[in-house]
């Protein structure tokens, strides 16, 4: 099913770039504007890119770790990690290749956010042969992709109950469904009954608070914990880490002093910087702007 979704995305990208006005969208999407980057703040751009990497790859919450534990020992973890990163980047690139040029073709503002997929794509499908069929299939596959993402995110919680508590999968899933429903209520009520609760000032809501806690707190702190655990002798240690990463057949992670130094000292520092900048940006915006602009 995901292969079919990928195939439809390729067809959509081909169709979109042939629309009138799509060329300007391609320029907007593919040609970097370094002047605007400097005006916005290079530090802010880098921070936003790193934050997106945390989010899109589910770093810091153990999802990749759990799925990595499910693959056979003969597989190369290095190769699988590069494959996941490459495929994720390719899909994101294709999505941009579809949405941004379509915005220019249909005179839409490209900065409107995720909802653009439901605005631009129906227009694209309307101009394609068998567009209704392709559109129905695309949004159906998108729904299943979203569901599979939800399953992936909560697999580590389900696995926790199964591995450490000996709970059956069916019971662990049922417990998590109940917990998700209860914990999701404040977010849902934040747009009506709890709309008066504005944690970050006027215009903010419960969803903004939860997004900040996950994106700016749990993901970077979780990633920092994993990095320190894998590289510190108080945790797993680099020797055990390299042994596990380079087990199996295929691509190996180079075991040299430069990479070891990077993993042990530079990488934790970068993750810590992402965490600190997220809080400074939220709670000390004037100081943040003076530094990064």
Placement of each model-derived feature along the sequence:
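Membrane-interface segments at loop-to-transmembrane junctions
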Residues: 79-87, 249-261
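Alpha-helical transmembrane segments
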Residues: 153-167, 202, 206, 228-256
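Flexible glycine/proline-rich, aromatic-decorated loop/lid segments
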Residues: 99, 110-118, 195-200, 204, ...
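A generic transmembrane alpha-helix motif of multi-pass inner-membrane proteins
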Residues: 199-228, 252-293
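Hydrophobic alpha-helical segments and their helix-loop junctions in multi-pass secondary transporters
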Residues: 6-32, 101, 105, 186-192, ...
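Hydrophobic alpha-helical segments of multi-pass membrane transport proteins
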Residues: 147-152, 173-187, 191, 208-243, ...
């Amino acid at each position: 099913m995901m292969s079919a979704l990928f195939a439809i995305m390729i067809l959509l990208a081909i169709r979109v770039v042939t629309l009138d006005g799509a060329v300007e969208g391609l320029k907007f999407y593919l040609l970097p504007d370094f002047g605007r980057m400097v005006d916005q703040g290079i530090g802010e751009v880098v921070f936003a890119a790193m934050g997106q990497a945390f989010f899109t790859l589910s770093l810091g919450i153990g999802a990749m770790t759990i799925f990595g534990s499910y693959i056979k020992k003969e597989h190369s973890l290095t190769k699988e990690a590069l494959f996941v990163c490459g495929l994720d980047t390719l899909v994101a690139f294709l999505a941009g290749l579809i949405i941004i040029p379509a915005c220019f073709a249909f005179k839409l503002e490209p900065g409107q956010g995720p909802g653009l997929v439901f605005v631009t794509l129906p227009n694209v499908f309307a101009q394609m042969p068998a567009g209704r069929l392709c559109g129905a299939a695309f949004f159906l596959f998108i729904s299943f992709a979203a569901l599979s993402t939800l399953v992936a995110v909560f697999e580590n919680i389900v696995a926790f109950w199964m591995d450490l508590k000996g709970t059956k999968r069916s019971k662990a899933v049922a417990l998590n469904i109940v917990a998700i429903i209860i914990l999701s209520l404040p977010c849902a009520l934040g747009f009506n009954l709890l709309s008066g609760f504005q944690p970050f000032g006027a215009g903010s809501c419960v969803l903004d608070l939860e997004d900040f806690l996950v994106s700016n707190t749990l993901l970077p702190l979780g990633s920092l914990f994993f990095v320190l655990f894998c590289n510190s002798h108080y945790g797993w240690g680099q020797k055990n880490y390299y042994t596990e990463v380079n087990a199996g057949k295929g691509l190996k992670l180079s075991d040299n002093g430069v990479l070891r130094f990077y993993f042990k000292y530079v990488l934790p520092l970068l993750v810590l910087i992402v965490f600190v900048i997220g809080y400074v940006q939220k709670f000390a915006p004037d100081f943040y702007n003076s530094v990064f602009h």
